[in-house]
């Protein structure tokens, strides 16, 4: 788990160097009876363990490049493991496909393809920063209820928490961000502005994680 946390922190620093931000909302696309992720997983599978990285997603190419770097880092650190990534926003999936020409699949398609591929152990690592409603829906509904209970109860599953899940995590991330930007902040004319997606309810307790980092 500490390895996961370390690479989440590294990913956060990489992501903050990207200049683009986007707001994606879910839509109700027509579902196909054929799961296109099945073929991808079947062709990729080399080991008995898989890691599925889950992120809300983005429509900016700079951010998509960062995701590719995150995947490469995980493959380097977990060489005996197959690594996959899924966006949880369907709108981000569609827009990323349109801008890059690269096929991307919905979360349930990845989960079913991985579950049917014969893996004995699956780790689902959230790349969400705060434990907001998107993260809770992922872990409580998509992973726990659907994947672990209803679909594949025989698979050993590890759920990796979001980046700012504990007070210690918050302190470490704040220190990483400070160290990354301190040289630029030495000049009084410079400021650093970090933006997060947040939650629609301003009273949602996960939103306080941002002020805690500050």
Region roles according to the model:
Residues 25-214:
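Extended amphipathic ligand-handling, pore-lining, and cofactor/metal-binding catalytic surfaces
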Residues 18-23:
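C-terminal motif of bacterial Sec signal peptides marking the signal peptidase cleavage site
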């Amino acid at each position: 788990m500490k390895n996961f946390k370390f690479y989440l922190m590294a990913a956060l620093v990489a992501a903050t160097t990207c200049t683009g931000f986007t707001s994606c909302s879910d839509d109700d696309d027509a579902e196909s009876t054929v799961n296109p992720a099945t073929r991808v997983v079947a062709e990729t599978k080399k080991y008995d363990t898989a890691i599925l990285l889950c992120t809300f997603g983005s429509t900016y190419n700079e951010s998509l490049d960062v995701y590719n770097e995150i995947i490469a880092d995980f493959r380097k650190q977990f060489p005996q493991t197959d690594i996959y990534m899924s966006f949880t926003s369907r709108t981000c999936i569609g827009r990323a496909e349109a801008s890059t020409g690269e096929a991307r699949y919905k979360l349930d398609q990845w989960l079913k393809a991985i579950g049917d591929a014969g893996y004995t152990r699956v780790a689902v690592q959230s790349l969400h920063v705060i434990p907001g409603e998107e993260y809770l829906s992922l872990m409580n509904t998509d992973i726990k209820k659907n994947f672990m209970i209803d679909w594949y109860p025989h698979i050993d599953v590890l759920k990796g928490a979001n980046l700012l899940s504990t007070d210690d995590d918050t302190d470490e991330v704040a220190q990483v961000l400070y160290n990354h930007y301190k040289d630029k902040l030495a000049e009084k004319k410079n400021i650093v502005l970090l933006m997060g997606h947040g939650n629609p309810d301003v009273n949602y307790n996960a939103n306080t994680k941002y002020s805690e980092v500050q």
